[in-house]
Regions:
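Mobile cap/lid helix-loop segments that gate and shape the active-site cleft of serine hydrolases
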Residues: 1
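Bacterial carbohydrate/catabolite-sensing allosteric modules
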Residues: 4-196
Length: 196
């Protein structure tokens, strides 16, 4: 969902970013992880990144896991927040700190892949040392080694719905519509159950 969008003026097609982000973090928690890093966009972002951070916090709060704000890492890049480069940089910074964690959740598969590269370069292993979860369902996440767990967005269905709404608005002067799709949790090689 898009916060701040006037639903009377605009149409929208999206996933519920809070709900789907919570689903990703719930999965990590169910695998025994409590010290979970969140790689996000700018701290002032109230749209996609901000909503996914809300889902992260909600999952931890519901399980009464304390939120360590030092494990929420933000990029300050304005236009290219969701990139592999930013995931890589944020993870390198974190690995050089004293913060302890067992899992990484990135707001995009691209950031998850960048973070994974930094983890592997540090001599650590995925998932033996750190589990990694992304968001989007990009093909590259499947082909990366180890394959990245993710929340897959139904991109084709969302594109079809967007076209349908657009043509209906143009041809029939229809009212604005808002469609929310469910994402799919896809657990792959990058997430492992934590042995306590």
């Amino acid at each position: 969902m898009f916060e701040g969008v006037d639903k009377k003026i605009y149409s929208s097609v999206s996933v519920d970013d809070v709900k789907e982000s919570k689903k990703a973090v719930d999965c990590l928690c169910e695998y025994g992880h409590e010290k979970i890093v969140m790689l996000a966009a700018q701290p002032w972002d109230e749209s996609i990144s901000g909503l996914r951070v809300q889902g992260y916090k909600k999952a931890l709060e519901e399980r009464q896991i304390p939120i360590n704000e030092n494990l929420i890492r933000y990029t300050f890049q304005e236009e290219t927040a969701f990139t592999m480069e930013n995931g890589y940089k944020l993870m390198k910074e974190l690995l050089e700190s004293d913060e302890e964690f067992t899992a990484v959740y990135a707001i995009s598969d691209s950031m998850a892949i960048g973070a994974s590269k930094a983890i592997l370069e540090s001599g650590k292993k995925i998932p033996e040392d750190y589990s990694v979860m992304g968001f989007d369902g990009l093909d590259i996440a499947y082909y990366y080694n180890p394959s990245i767990s993710t929340i897959r967005q139904p991109v084709e269905d969302m594109a079809k719905e967007t076209s349908k709404i657009l043509f209906d608005l143009i041809e029939n002067n229809a009212d604005n519509r808002h469609k929310i799709f469910d994402g799919e949790l896809v657990v792959r090689q990058s997430v492992v159950r934590l042995n306590k």
